Amino acid sequence: MQFVLHKTASGVTRARRGTVHLNHGDVQTPAFMPVGTYGTVKGMLPRDIEAIGADIILGNTFHLWLRPGTDIIDKFGGLHKFMHWDKPILTDSGGFQVFSLGAMRKITEEGVTFKSPIDGAKVFLSPEKSMQIQYSLNSDIVMQFDECTPYPATHDEAKKSLELSLRWGQRCVDEHKNLGSTNALFGIIQGSMYADLRKQSLEGLLEIGFDGYAIGGLSVGEPKEEMIDVLDYIADDMPADKPRYLMGVGKPEDLVEGVRRGVDMFDCVMPTRNARNGHYFVTGDADNAGVVRIRNSQYRTDEGPLDPECDCYTCQNFSRAYLSHLNKCKEMLGAQLATIHNLRYYQRLMQNIRDAIEQDKFDEFVNEFYSKRGQTVPELNLR
């Protein structure tokens, strides 16, 4: 993997424009990665994902390991061939899914024992096993196995958790090397909401050495203000010559705020999940903060496109009234068209951000973005 930093935005912002060169292609940053948990982005054919402009998607190590299993995916030569996607794939390590199991899991120094959510069988996942699974999947970007610190957590709990993740991180690097993998391996910064612990985690990861660095342990129930605080005091300390990835975040404004603080990569289920629930992201609509809730009665006879500024297949061919009809009837096509639009909205957002950085107009872009949504630009408190 190679990361090339092309430009940093002018002014006080830390926004960056770059390219991540990976085994299956290049990723233009800042980038948003659609989530394909089970080897598919819900409601999307691979050609649809490419058409909306995605350079990279995210797969889920935990779920693909349990079903269909790496033995089956191995027969196809990896996840790319299994799902017919020839561009880059990032896979998470399984740490967040294990975290979400709650009482169903037991964490030790060696790894995590839990009951499979599929059949209740006892399963063990370790840093080494996570690396082996991701090696079988042939992910372009492999994530270290970590413990996602819950929120809230005491200082002692968060410290103990991050130190376990650091030890696991070293084991991940060792196993990654033993496997002879040529794919990139990213470390994950933990430490809950504590500035000193976040810095301790980052320093520990830098000593181990990774190809890129991710900010984990956010979007786990904390107030947005605390999430932004973490970004304010950690993002700029991350190496300038490595990709910076904010995991599991989020709303369009969260992406903009992450970019303002120097983040390069994002993923979240929000655009696809919200699409299935009839919530569509649009460029304007200041009265509704950039969201059309298609179930509202006002759209029942609306002849206009979902988003007049959008070039996606949905907006170019269908009215809000038709989308309202499909949603009310619970037709599969409605969810598919909604997903196409929401993911295209996110990709257009990132493209517009990249263009604005290149043209030294990022501050103007930010002002216009919030103005169209009827929102004020949040303060930037970089430390």
Swiss-Prot record:
Family per record: Belongs to the queuine tRNA-ribosyltransferase family.
Cofactor(s) needed: Zn(2+)
HAMAP family, A to Z: Q_tRNA_Tgt
Protein name: Queuine tRNA-ribosyltransferase
Source organism per UniProt: Psychrobacter cryohalolentis (strain ATCC BAA-1226 / DSM 17306 / VKM B-2378 / K5)
Reaction equations catalysed: 7-aminomethyl-7-carbaguanine + guanosine(34) in tRNA = 7-aminomethyl-7-carbaguanosine(34) in tRNA + guanine
Disulfide bond positions: none
PANTHER family the record matches: QUEUINE TRNA-RIBOSYLTRANSFERASE
Assigned EC number: 2.4.2.29
Entry binding sites for substrate: D92, S93, G94, G95, F96, D146, Q190, G217
Cofactor-binding details, from the entry: Binds 1 zinc ion per subunit.
Pathway stated in the Swiss-Prot or TrEMBL entry: tRNA modification; tRNA-queuosine biosynthesis
Annotated spans, RNA binding: 248-254, 272-276
GO molecular function term, any single one: tRNA-guanosine(34) queuine transglycosylase activity
Active site: D92, D267
Gene for this chain: tgt
Top EC category: transferase
Keywords: Glycosyltransferase, Metal-binding, Queuosine biosynthesis, Transferase, tRNA processing, Zinc
SUPFAM superfamilies from the UniProt entry: tRNA-guanine transglycosylase (SSF51713)
GO CC entries: cytosol
InterPro entries recorded: ArchSynthase1/Queuine_TRR, TGT, TGT-like_sf, tRNA_ribo_trans-like
